[in-house]
A protein has these predicted regions:
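Long low-complexity, intrinsically disordered regions
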Residues: 6, 10, 29, 64-300
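Charge-enriched amphipathic alpha-helical scaffolds
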Residues: 4-44
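C-terminal engagement modules used by replication, chromatin/transcription, nuclear envelope/ESCRT
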Residues: 35-86
Length: 300
């Protein structure tokens, strides 16, 4: 709207009808040279007909900023592209910028589950800062050239050193790896606690799950509470992979999907799991004793 006011006033004194045609046309022609932002400051990656219609109706809702990728920013930008395994560039258009940043937002939005978006159980604090910066990003240019380097401990002056720029890329690689593995790391910790509590020294899922099922196969379900019966059914259900089995048994102990677990709930979850396994062991012993008694045999 400020641009329109300037063009309507002296010395330009352009007509509103002309501006309604010229401004969208100019923006379309120059769309590779600027970044566009909406009313709430959110970045708009694609310019389409719907945008032009809204621009004519509500010009004050939008702002533009020239895309500045030069000097140190170009080095940082090409490190992002190196991470994505795409070729380095000597100059950057808006399409190049969108192509480069889009995978990072897709990774956060679509490849991280709820647990990964909230946990802080990482080997490196930079991992949580990397994720949290993506989570609140509105201005991608500021996010990728200012906020992320700062969050990961790299100031503007430091990044003038090309070795530091490469180190910055390494930290991002490491953060992505830790984010991808954190949910499996959670299951690893739960698995270790369960096997230790049950005294099982076999660590291959396909093997130890058979031991657990055999141990509890004699339980008389009529002795179990509703909650324990639900847990018992989850324990005995056959799953092809470890992840699904742990998600299943944890659902009863947590009373919500495992991926919604928060860090301060992990200790209680493990405690509840072990308690329910102990209960199942107790009722398994009782059921075997009853079976032996009915057969007139002595049980040990």
């Amino acid at each position: 709207s400020e641009l329109i006011k300037i063009l309507l006033a002296r010395p330009y004194k352009l007509k509103q009808g002309f501006l309604d045609f010229w401004i969208p046309t100019y923006f379309y022609i120059k769309k590779q040279e600027y970044s566009l932002y909406g009313a709430n400051g959110a970045y708009i990656p694609n310019v389409n007909m719907e945008f032009f219609e809204l621009l004519q109706k509500h010009p004050g809702d939008y702002s533009v900023k020239a895309l500045d990728v030069s000097g140190v920013r170009m080095d940082i930008f090409n490190q992002y592209r190196k991470f994505l395994n795409v070729r380095a560039l000597g100059s950057v258009t808006n399409d190049d910028f969108v192509e480069t940043i889009k995978p990072f937002f897709f990774f956060y939005s679509h490849q991280l589950n709820t647990y990964a978006k909230h946990t802080r159980k990482f080997n490196h604090e930079q991992t949580a800062r990397f994720r949290d910066t993506l989570a609140v990003a509105k201005d991608p240019e500021k996010t990728f050239f200012e906020d992320l380097p700062e969050a990961l401990g790299f100031c503007k002056e430091t990044l003038c050193d090309k070795d530091k720029v490469e180190e910055f890329c390494y930290v991002i690689n490491r953060a992505v790896r830790e984010l991808r593995s954190c949910y499996n790391d959670l299951i690893d910790r739960i698995e270790a606690s369960v096997l230790d509590a049950l005294g099982i020294e076999v660590y291959e899922y396909s093997e130890y799950v058979k031991i657990i099922r055999d141990r509890f196969s004699s339980v008389n379900e009529h002795l179990l509470t509703d909650r324990l019966k639900e847990f018992y059914h989850h324990v005995l259900t056959e799953f092809d992979n470890r992840k699904e089995w742990y998600q299943s048994i944890c659902y009863t102990a947590l009373e919500q999907p495992l991926e919604r677990l928060r860090d301060d709930q992990e200790e209680k979850l493990v405690h509840n799991l072990i308690s329910m396994f102990r209960e199942c062991e107790k009722y398994s012993d009782i059921s075997r004793m009853n079976a032996c008694g009915n057969d007139g045999e002595e049980c040990f």
